[in-house]
Amino acid sequence: MHRIIIPTTLLSLTLLSPQISSAQDFTVVKQNPITSVKDQNESGTCWDYATLGFVESEILRTTGKTYDLCEMFVVNKDYMDCAIHHVRMHGFSQIAEGGSADDVFEVIKKYGICPEEAMPAPGSLVGDSLANFNEFRKVLKPAVQYFGTGTNHTYPADALGVSSKNFKTIPGWQDSVQTIIDRYVGKCPEKFVYEGKTYTPKTFAESLGIDWNNYISLTSFTHHPFYEDFVIEAMHKWRLRPSFNLPIDRLMSILDNAINAGYCVAWGGDVSGNFWANGEAYLPNSKLPVTQEIRQQQWDDWTFTYDHVMLIYGIAKKANGKKYYMVKNSWGTQYGHKGIWYMSEDFIKLNTTYLFLCKDAVKKKMLKP
């Protein structure tokens, strides 16, 4: 989830890349409108930037209007929700920067959203020009644990052999944690003016013309039955929102159909390997097809994990005829092809944790055996 962590690995992999491709090496087959590439900088908020980019592309698709929505509004609300959940679970849940596409939609449905200009610019409150959580990440979790449980234990009390009944939450702890979050990412506005009109975050979300309940998360694993919902067992899925389980070939068909029908898709998956800084992701020297069994094996042995979220917005082909997907990242324009990656079909097939997209992009028959 961290740009600061993943690119460190990514940059070392760059030296191992067999060849450097340029954008001219790819022929666009289908390309859907997106907004500009953003930079999450030193913050573990890929899930936020990618999903708001997805929302912006949905607004473009449905209204033709361009918006720059505020990532730090979502961070503020989501981190507070996460802190409350962490305390209610007596520490037996994550409190970290990572998240998923579900989080963004849950925040918007509950609290609304605002444009970028309605809050302090990312990083400005800590003397940076972009989001910088280097200090924030060191402060937030200990603060939640101290104010929420009255202890500075870094692990759940019961895990230390001490009953959580020995600890009590400190009265007003939520206000204390909220003050810290506001200090680092900015306080969310109650009202703001946008293009001459006054909005609350809720009325602004309503004005965007999006049905926030008309979206679905799809996945593909064999440790749960196909054609049923289940919660993906990943640490950043703390809201426990379900995904609908499908065979991988069916999932790939849905992705293709959606892109070709003019929809963008939020993608959650693994970029810890074979994801080159020059803007290409593929499985080198891969002669065997990616199967459902290989995916499951790599998920089970932790070769394949959930560590990044991006936006798929198009399909392209390389000169050798190999199929790629066009992907908008959130690491600024200094990486990839000015912030765009080309991910091969087999890479996507192996490394996809979930797809998040509009229900209208999915034919109902595709969700049935």
Where is each model-derived feature located?
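Bacterial Sec-dependent N-terminal signal peptides
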Residues: 1-24
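N-terminal regions that are enriched for targeting/export leaders
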Residues: 24-32
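Cross-family signature of deubiquitinases and ubiquitin-like deconjugating cysteine proteases
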Residues: 33-58, 62, 77
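Active-site signature of cysteine proteases
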Residues: 35, 162-171, 175-369
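Active-site nucleophilic cysteine motif
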Residues: 41-55, 95-102, 173, 308
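Structural recognition of the beta-strand scaffold that forms the well-ordered cores
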Residues: 45-48, 72-76, 104-107, 115-118, ...
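Sec-exported extracytoplasmic/periplasmic mature domains
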Residues: 51-60, 109-113, 260, 317
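Papain-like cysteine protease catalytic cores
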Residues: 71-195
